[in-house]
Amino acid sequence: MRLSPDQTRVILQCVRQQFGADVGVMLFGSRLDDGARGGDVDLLVESPSPPSLLQRARATMALEAALNLPVAIVVTQRGTPGSAFARIARSQAQWLEVPA
C-alpha cells in the first residue's frame, strides 16, 4: 500500500470528520500496488446513512488539500450491495486503520 502512516491518519480523520465516526474507510485502486507510481487516492467509504453531496465535496476538497494528491471517494450505505462499481472496488479494497 502506497500510503504513509501520516497519510492514513489524515484520511481517516478527514473522512470521519465529514461523514461521522462510525464510517469504514477502504483503499482501492493503484495505491494498493507497491510497484506502481503516482495515481490518485481511491477511497470506498461505508456509511450507516447516505451522506449528502455537500459532505462528499467537502471531504474530497479537505483530503486533496491535506494530501496534495487527487482523491476519488465512492460512498456506499452499510448493509446494501451498492453499485456494480462499488462491489468491484470492495472486492479489491483494503481497510484503512489508524497506524500504531
Regions found by a protein language model. Give the residues of each.
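Catalytic core of pol beta-like nucleotidyltransferases
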Residues: M1-M26, L32-G38, S47-A100
